[in-house]
Structure formats: C-alpha cells, structure tokens
Amino acid sequence: MMANKFAGGEMGRVIRLVVALLLASIGSVQPSMAAGTLKVAVPSNLNTLDPAKTKIGEEYIVNFLVFGGLTEIDRNGKTIPDIAERWTASDDLKTWTFYLRKGVKFHHGREVDAQDVITTVQRIQDKATGSVTRVNFELIDKMEAPDSRTVRFTLKAPYAGLADIFSDRQARIVPRDRLDSLARAPIGSGPFKLKSFTPGDRVELEKFADYYVPGVPVLDQVIIRIMPESAAQAAAVETGEVDLVWNLPLESVDQFKKNPNIVIDSVPTSTWDGIIMNGAHKPFDDSRVRHAVAMAIDKKAMVELALFGYGTPTNTMIPPGHPYYNNDIKIGAPDVSGAKKLLAEAGYPNGFDITIYTPVGRPTRERIGLAVREMLKPVNIRVDIQRVPWDKFINEIEGKQAFYVDGFYSRPTIDSSIYPWYHSNGSWNTTLWNYKNADMDRILESARAARTDADQKSSYLKFQALALEDPPGVIPYVINHMNAVRKNVKGFQSSPMMWLDLRKVSIQ
C-alpha cells in the first residue's frame, strides 16, 4: 500500500527519473559489477607450472588458464580451434598442416609463431623433459615452419587424432624465449597471466588484456587457494571466503545441497581412480595374481563406498555409454572361488600380506583403500593401509611401490586415454604399473592406425576383452565431476575434462 501511495505526484516523477538514469547507465555499470576476483579452493599443492611436466589436476587448472593450445575440446568432446584457426591432413593422414591465428600474443607481448609450436613439441618429445604425454607425440617424425604462421607435421604412420592430442593438458604452447621460467613464473597466451605463485598456499592470476577473444575474460583476477582439508573447503565456500570448490569432496555433496547460496554443478567424465598393481614387483609380476585381485573387487559396491553413488562401474577407462564400450563384458559380482584358484595356481594357496598406499587429501582414493582391504579378505589377501601425504606420494610411491591407489583425469580421445597406460612403451605405463603384453601392443597400434571408425571400434573391443583377462590394475569406475559454486558466480559450467574454463565467468 505504501508503494502505491507514492507512485504518483512529485515523488513518483523522481523515482521514474532515477530508474531511467539507472537503465540508461546499466551498460556501463554491468561490466564493473561482473568483474572482480574469483577465489577457488583446491585440495593439493602444485609442484610445477611447466605444462609439459604437469601431472595432477591442480596443475592442469593453471595450464588451461595461463596457456593456449593449438586446439581445444568443447563440452561435447569436439575438437575446435584455439591458437590454430584451422588445419588440414593429407589423404594418408601422415602430413598435417596447422595454420595459426593472427594476433595471438604471449603475456610478454610477442605474437605466438610457428617456432614456438615446434619448440613445444620438441620439449615434449625430449625424454629429459619427462612429460607423461611424450608417447602421444613420438609419432611425429618431422616438423617444419613454411612461414611464421604455418606448422607442418610429418608422421611416422597414419594417425587421425593429431589435432585432438594438441588439446591435451601437457601440450600447451610455450614461448621459446621464456623456457627457463616455466616451472615457477610461466608466460603463456591464455586468458589469464600469472601474478604470483606461492607453493603450498596459492596461485594468483590476473586478466590478460590482450587475449585474442574480444571481451574475454570478464574476471579481473583468479586466486587459487590450496586447502587440503575438506572441512576447511566447506567452511570457506559457505562463508564466502572462496567462491568455488573444485572437485568437491563427495562426502560434502549432501551438506551443500541444503545451502541455498551454493549450487552443485556436476558432469559425467571418463576420469577414473585405480588400484595399481606394479608388475615390476612381486607378486604382481604374475598376471594370475593381478587377475585374482580384479576378480575379488566388487565394482558396484565400490561406487557406493568410494563415490557415494556419484559414478559408474566400468572395466577400463572407456565408460559405459561410449560407442566403443564392450557391452558383452558384464560387470557382475566378485568371483571369490575363481580368484582363490588363480592365486593357488600362482603359488599363493594361502594368500599373502601386502601394503596398499593411499594419498592423503584424495578422500575417494582413501576410501578405495579401505574397501580393497575388506574385499580382499575373502581371498586371503591381507592388506595393510599406509596413508601418505600427497607430495610424498607423488615422489616416493607413484611408480615405485607395488600396490597403491591412484587416479587420472579424462583425456581428449580414446587413444590418448588408453595407449599411454596400456602400451608397453606408454609414458604412463612405464611410470605406473610396468605392464607388458605383446598382444595388447599390437591391438593398440592397430587402433591408432585405424582409418575407419569400424576398424577402430573393433580394436577397442578386443582391448577391453584382453584387459579383463590380463589387467595391469583395477579400474572400478568412472567419476561424476562436481564443483560447489556460490550463486553469485555466473556463467560457470563443469567440464568433462575437469579443467576450469573461466573465460566467461563473472561475479554478480
């Protein structure tokens, strides 16, 4: 009633004038309202900012904010242009030419050119760099720069996925004249540039005003806070100390669903956690032991125990629903008698004692460790759990111990998701579980060289069948990626690749 009383007369005219002025100026006000600082919580410390050497999700986040790639993957899994505005391939798929977009600048002002691309690939190919994506780029035999904006790659064999792998995490294009500073003070061509990096505490980024996409990014700054404890993350986002919790601990989901100021944004992925059995160590040098462990694991129960139901059981990193998924292989109940038989054949009729290592700060993987201990009791494998701080886990456990829980993020293609892990020369295989199977090598090489979708699918169906009989480890599920986002954050969408695309995100 009070509002109606003052709707007319002099007061009404004043109100209408003020509203008109506000509407007239909203175009100039809106950008400043949408700018500001986005604060993100992540669980683990970053060891390096050199994209070729990155290995964990927190590092990948910075890769995509600070650096550009020749290509990128959209939310539908399609490869689209980034620094390269277009590309062509010869009929035999052995010669690929990428044409660089004009006006893409590095943060120090120089334009990205063909030699930067060549230098980037050379670093990845160099074993001394230690890049886990090296195996994907070993098929490049020769690189040429016909001019400053053209790069030509000649391959050792036909390969249809070259443009796809240039979208990957470690394949970010780096400036050839700033290589020495990449680990701690990198310069890229992405939407944000590094302001500061304090290991163990935070990464601060600021808008790159000369980013090649007009009007992007909207945010002035991004601050990535390292918060190992899930309780601290929860408190921070609920109070507004941070605006977004990346890769939300699943035990916190129900709590956040009750908060009207927070949105749970989720997306299915092909990201997986795995039970790693290192073939360089006994007893896992015997495939029968690895197979027995796999037979004893209840994957459907693992989804509930480790993920609280926010995932899907699977046999390999090819998720159910993918066109190449082998539907003839069913995910059933554990086969305890079959596992015991294999263990007896391998010389372990009474089972054995083993330590499994789990990383602190990765709660789903810690829950896997607990579940493994219980699931292996019926087959007389007695498991002791050792919890290891994340930094120590990366440096002293991963690839070095016999039995541990690890995890890996979605890759842009099936080939880049599988070949590095299962081929005997795969760069993840040789630093993870040291798996060797000549038949598997032939299958994966055939899939990589396939010229038709039908041929590629045939190879991957065979891959899944062989991985079931001779597993290097156990992949129990693929994960639903979840982020907790305050409602004043606009334009954010979770990525199936689990990176943060903040180019069009704003704060209201």
Regions found by a protein language model. Name each.
Residues 44-60, 83-84, 110, 132-133, ...:
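A structural "hinge/loop" feature
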Residues 180, 210-255, 382:
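Ligand-site clamp/hinge motif
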Residues 39, 113-120, 148-154, 190-191, ...:
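Alpha-helical secondary-structure segments
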Residues 76-78, 166-217, 221, 229-231, ...:
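Gly/Pro-rich hinge or "lid" segments in bacterial periplasmic/extracellular proteins
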Residues 198, 273, 296-324, 360, ...:
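Detector for C-terminal structural segments
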Residues 85-130, 146, 152, 236, ...:
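Aromatic- and charge-enriched surface segment that lines or borders ligand/interaction sites
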